[in-house]
Amino acid sequence: MNHPSLPPQSERRALAIAQAVYEAFEDYHARFSEITACAKQRFETRDWSGAREDAVARIALYDQYIAECMLRLRAVLLGQAHDRALWMRARDRYAALLSGLIDQELYKTFYNTLTRRYFGTHGVDADIEFIALDIEPTDAITVPVARHTYAVSPGRLTDMLVRVLGDYAFAVPYAHRTRCAAAIAVRLLDDLAHWGEHPVRSVELLETVFYRERRAYLVGRVFGEHRFSPCVIALINDDAGLRAEAVLTRRSDVAQLFSNSRSYFQADLSTVGDAVVFLRSLLTHKPVDELYTMLGRAKQGKTERYRTFFSHFQAHPSEQLVHADGTPGMVMVVFTLPSYPLVFKLIRDRFAYPKTMSRAQVEGKYELVFQLDRIGRLLDAQPYRFLRFPKARFSPALLQELQTSCAMSLSEDGDDVLIALCYVQRRLRPLNLYLREQLPEAAHAAALDYGQAIKDMARNNIFPGDMLLKNFGITRHQRAVFYDYDELCLITECNFRDWPTPATYEEQMAAEPWFHVGPRDVFPERFALFMGLPSSQLEAVKHQHPELFDPRWWRDLQSRLRDDDYPDTPPYAESRRLA
């Protein structure tokens, strides 16, 4: 959108603003790429603690470069930081600099973040921000992402895969490249046998290798005569050497690999939008916002999530926001739009007993989640500030509770409600409701996976704190995921104790502990009392996961974690591993 010209001095200043913001984003992108590129060496040298440090450092970059850009702009703005006409013109100048760029949406989000910092924007400001609720920006990306394509001659699949592994070389050699290629070939032929004779006609893999935790992934597609399927080759570098560990061709397996309950990939992509377009061809049901987020572009993920939600929200003007299903929380009020799979979580002004933490501590827990390896068990929770909703869109019961319980987060502006801070997550079915609704076999499997989820988190130094079923949800792929973080802490911070043996009848019958319990004391032998599982499912969990109730297991694990010895947690089922 072009606006009337400003005086020559202001025109020059608008251009200087645009150039400064452009250069700041370029600097951010270069540093982002620099950290991401370290993932290859971390993988080669098995420097897993360094990889975790890189992941945390990369998340912090965005706000660091926004702050640095604001410092640079001081010399340009000269007291005109809140001149709307100047920023409107700067936006036009900035848009001109982005013409033809594949990733111009990332640049625009950076610009929007700056204007929101300067103007304290509540909702959106269409005059100075880049707003496009009615379009899908990736639809305009037609440039194909960089990839390798391999044709397959009949009977020569293993030979082709030997070449693939050679093209993706590392500083450490494959333990046995031909054997790896043969195992991959067998799995592909088994998985795709229903495609008929000679099912694999070609394979297409992104040039960029994806890294996360202890694995590297070659991500692409396998083509038959009339169809294609995802093809992800997982590489591992451990005591047995560098080798292919798994091949994923099922969309459900690949979707779980890219789940928003996992940590972000380290993938050194020169451009991101074209990679998102490619990944959407593999995962057609995966929202664009989650793909951007999983590639480490969390701010862009937030932008796309906002864009798609409010586009849907405006297209359904008669639908009201209501309380989300599930047991009301003592720390959060949670609401949703029934037709859209997101929930919005607001911190209550006061917490019911026995919750004793402060509001700042709750916010700190949600920030901590970004720094952890979430290993498919912690749902991504993005913070949003100053969201604006029409007051009429809230159900009366929801609006009343927000006004009485979340007044610190809520304000009214005419016919609108402003939310100062909320956390937005994918909506899952709460586990306590799911177990009641399912047939016994499905409920049994979910209960066992709930136990596995607690173990997976523990092995990555995560203790949920509150193990009640209502704090877990079930994904589309029937996977138990934790999503309520107000009591989450690190395993290494806990004191795992044996439950004392009562010495007297009075102690044995006491309703409360007869001994001192410190704020970090945890008693695994008592977990069964706080899980809320029906007796048959509880017995199944005890049988399948007995270590959960053994304080010695927790103390041994704690000792390993303190020595930086993190057990491996593969992101796929044992059945997907190669022979």
UniProtKB/Swiss-Prot annotation:
InterPro entries linked: AceK_kinase, AceK_regulatory, Isocitrate_DH_AceK
Q: Name one Pfam family in it.
A: AceK_kinase
Q: What is the active site of this protein?
A: D380
The catalytic activity, as recorded, is: L-seryl-[isocitrate dehydrogenase] + ATP = O-phospho-L-seryl-[isocitrate dehydrogenase] + ADP + H(+)
One GO cellular component term noted in the UniProt record for this chain: cytoplasm
Keyword DNA-binding attributed:
no
Subcellular location, record wording: Cytoplasm
Gene Ontology terms: biological process: glucose metabolic process; glyoxylate cycle; tricarboxylic acid cycle
Q: Which residues bind ATP?
A: A324, D325, G326, T327, P328, G329, M330, K345
* Record family assignment: Belongs to the AceK family.
What role does this protein play?
Answer: Bifunctional enzyme which can phosphorylate or dephosphorylate isocitrate dehydrogenase (IDH) on a specific serine residue. This is a regulatory mechanism which enables bacteria to bypass the Krebs cycle via the glyoxylate shunt in response to the source of carbon. When bacteria are grown on glucose, IDH is fully active and unphosphorylated, but when grown on acetate or ethanol, the activity of IDH declines drastically concomitant with its phosphorylation.
* Database matches in NCBIfam families: PRK02946.1 (NF002804)
Name of the protein in its database record: Isocitrate dehydrogenase kinase/phosphatase
Species the sequence originates in? Xanthomonas axonopodis pv. citri (strain 306)
Task: Name the gene.
Answer: aceK
